[in-house]
């Protein structure tokens, strides 16, 4: 009799697991460089698409990015819930001195090597392992085989998709969800970041692109309503970091004025965070010379502040330079990153940048969400980029992997903070009841 009772309990436990068809699907948007105050209450008056999301869902006051407040480190933090020193994607530019290979903002072939990506498992890989399909559009990294897995569909990133191409990707993502080709669709949008860099965070060019994005979002909301998907689809929109003004003619730190560049065997990146690998026997000399430089801090690896959650990263350099807000570190001014402004020559400075101390206000990002799992017209306290992973796992019914996010910071934005019963919880419940069943029968 006991074996039949045990079988009954197993069947009861399995019956509590929600069928995949019962779970709302998820549409994700990663908007690069979208600062939190781009959708302040005043700005929302002119952005009906964003306003729709706010009024029908959740808006956090702001989202603090991971350090450094750069793109690739935060792409991976958002999709793994881990600090950069834990997933090891610690910069847009990295170097492996043992193999003498580089990761150069995903543009070079070596950037696709597993060593840069296998430090953690992003959500789309976890879903594919669970036989739950994912479609991704221009999402950096979807083209990479991570832990021997790629998403079911990846429309590979290029620099940079037009508004028409982005609009089509949104339509295609929605269709992939409604036609049963995916349970999660993720779309990346870059132009807010591009115009913020080129013209500055409060430029008319950046504002115009925001209005174009808003129109696409408004059209999406209409499609969801017309297709009757309000109760079947969650929509989440977040950014990787913010943006601040830079004034290069006045606020440039030229390293050549302070150190002998012959003492450096490798330098990665420029701007707010710079990584240096001094030649053998030159570390102390270079460090002491850089300590005297104003408007920046220099850290030996072991002295990097704990709050950055950065120094334990595999590819962190012996010396890390961190500039004050608005200052730009470069070897010499001639190497400043210009853009050609539509001409054949480099004639224009950049006017916006990011990557600074992640606690600075201008580096803060945005998080919006609406759908059947989210409260309506709910303003949430600030969250961190590590927290987003747990939200996505909850609405998808995925057991989250170990991560650095906080559930207590985000649970109140959900209609039900308990979420779906997970397999682990149900197994624990079954094990607690099993001894009683053996006694009774």
Swiss-Prot record:
Bilayer topology term: Lipid-anchor; GPI-anchor
GO biological process, one term: lipid catabolic process
EC annotation from Swiss-Prot or TrEMBL: 3.1.4.-, 3.1.4.38
Name of the top EC class for this enzyme: hydrolase
Proregion span(s): 417-441
Transmembrane segments: none
Residues bearing attached sugar chains per UniProt: 100, 208, 341, 404
Keywords: Cell membrane, Disulfide bond, Glycoprotein, GPI-anchor, Hydrolase, Lipid degradation, Lipid metabolism, Lipoprotein, Membrane, Metal-binding, Phosphoprotein, Signal, Zinc
Record: active site: 71 (nucleophile)
Catalytic activity: sn-glycerol 3-phosphocholine + H2O = phosphocholine + glycerol + H(+); a 1-acyl-sn-glycero-3-phosphocholine + H2O = a 1-acyl-sn-glycerol + phosphocholine + H(+); a 1-O-alkyl-sn-glycero-3-phosphocholine + H2O = a 1-O-alkyl-sn-glycerol + phosphocholine + H(+); 1-dodecanoyl-sn-glycero-3-phosphocholine + H2O = 1-dodecanoyl-sn-glycerol + phosphocholine + H(+)
Pfam families: Phosphodiest
A single cellular component GO annotation: plasma membrane
Function: Choline-specific glycerophosphodiester phosphodiesterase. Has a lysophospholipase C activity.
Protein name: Glycerophosphocholine cholinephosphodiesterase ENPP6
Taxonomy of the source species: Eukaryota, Metazoa, Chordata, Craniata, Vertebrata
